[in-house]
UniProtKB/Swiss-Prot annotation:
GO terms for biological process: subtelomeric heterochromatin formation. This is Histone acetyltransferase type B subunit 2. Residues 353-357 are annotated as: Interaction with the histone H4 N-terminus. The gene is HAT2. Keywords: Chromatin regulator, Cytoplasm, Nucleus, Repeat, WD repeat.
Length: 419
């Protein structure tokens, strides 16, 4: 079967779904939507892998190295477990062996049969795991040394691991300050050993983990930084002293750690769940949450968002800028969707048919999950490769089709139309 992306593929999928609903006079079930998505995989993707884990993971992040193993590219991911107290929890390192062509952005057709193992069965395998105190709500590696991984659990305790070690030696430090569950955890890409955390206790803490002492206390704390649960914290991508937070109190705040002051206090109509700073523009950042919209902001004037992007049908749970492609943003949500946004297309003119398909900035909608998506990660080494983790133990790894012009380059001209 030749892998060709019909320019109207998304419209065709919508038409098929609409026809199925009209025929049954009832909305499609989640399983029916999944089967429809699966039938369109060869048309919409260069690669898809789905792995069912023993327990759900609330977190996923690609590790930066890649290795060539038996003519396949091996990439590793950070995963966690959430066993609800039924079994021991673990920090896990997963590995996936990708077909070499997945690392290329080739538009060449290739033959894929329905049982193509390269495309479908490159499952994530757990290659290393470390016992962990409680469920892992977030895990992130330190950019300056990817052997160092920080985790935070349901009690707000933070742990520092060295994944190059084994057994009890791998746990280097325990960081105690927060008193409740935490989802905010971020290393500073511009300052080694600098860690940021936020939790349900409404507090934010900054940590220096350089000594790897058994027990570490925060260097700076922001007591009652918010008046409700903190959903996320992130460092600015290029300014080492600036970070942001979002909260259930319907505020988003930007801080300067040099003065321990809030530099922007932004009131939002609904609580935001997540935020992200652009790696290409020092002024651009994004945030999203419970009103299903993805907002773009200019840090120089935060009085109003630059733009609000529509596409999700439920709360947005995670957003991430593409580290390889300027203007590309990913968002995932409780609607079981990950949307790939092309910010360069905002405001582009559309035909009536295109308007019915959705906003011009929607480049791709990944619709392969059956439950809410907990976290997403964009691969820093392989263009357009994404990992997404859902509530129902599933991790999917996928790469949009290189036949999509923005992904594979300018479309080739079909000279036959001139005959």
């Amino acid at each position: 079967m030749s892998v060709q992306l019909d320019p109207s593929a998304l419209q065709k999928m919508a038409e098929v779904a609409a026809a199925a609903e009209q025929q049954s006079n009832e909305p499609m079930t989640v399983d029916e939507e999944y089967e429809l998505w699966k039938s369109n995989v060869p048309m919409l993707y260069d690669f898809v892998s789905e792995t069912r884990l023993t327990w759900p993971t609330l977190t996923v992040e690609w590790l930066p190295q890649k290795n060539l193993v038996a003519a396949r590219t091996r990439q590793q991911l950070i995963l966690g477990t959430h066993t609800s107290g039924e079994e021991q929890n673990y920090l896990k390192i997963g590995a996936v062996d990708l077909p070499v062509e997945v690392t290329e952005n080739s538009k060449k057709d290739r033959e894929i049969d329905e049982e193509d193992e390269d495309m479908v069965l490159s499952n994530v395998k757990i290659v290393k795991k470390f016992p962990h105190d409680g469920e892992i709500t977030r895990a992130r590696y330190m950019p300056q040394d990817d052997n160092i991984i920080a985790t935070i659990n349901g009690e707000g305790k933070i742990f520092i691991y060295d994944r190059s070690k084994n057994g009890v030696e791998a746990l280097l430090s325990t960081l105690e300050y927060h008193t409740e569950n935490g989802y905010g955890l971020a290393f500073n890409a511009n300052e080694k050993y600098s860690l940021l955390s936020g939790s349900d206790d409404s507090n934010i803490a900054l940590w220096d983990i350089s000594n790897f002492e058994k027990n570490i206390k925060p260097t700076i704390t922001f007591e009652d930084a918010h008046t409700d649960i903190i959903n996320d914290v992130k460092w600015h991508s290029s300014e080492a002293h600036i970070f942001g937070s979002v909260s259930e109190d319907s505020t988003m705040k930007l801080f300067d750690k040099r003065s321990s002051q809030i530099i922007h206090n932004i009131n939002t109509k609904k609580p935001y769940n997540t935020l992200a700073f652009s790696p290409f523009s020092s002024n651009l950042f994004a945030a999203a949450g419970t009103d299903n919209l993805v907002y773009l902001y200019d840090i120089r004037d935060v009085s109003n968002p630059l733009y609000a992007m529509t596409g999700h049908e439920d709360a947005v749970t995670a957003i991430e800028f593409d580290p390889n492609n300027d203007g590309i943003l990913y968002s995932s949500g409780s609607d079981r969707r990950t949307i790939v946004w092309d910010l360069q297309e905002i405001g582009a003119e559309q035909t009536q048919d295109e308007i019915e398909d959705g906003p011009p900035e929607v480049l791709m909608i990944h619709a392969g999950h059956k439950t809410s998506i907990n976290d997403i990660a964009v691969n820093p080494n392989i263009n357009w490769l994404v990992a997404s983790a859902e509530e129902d133990n599933i991790v999917q790894i996928w790469k949009c089709s290189s036949n999509i012009p923005r992904i594979g380059g300018e479309p080739e001209v079909d000279l036959s139309i001139l005959d």
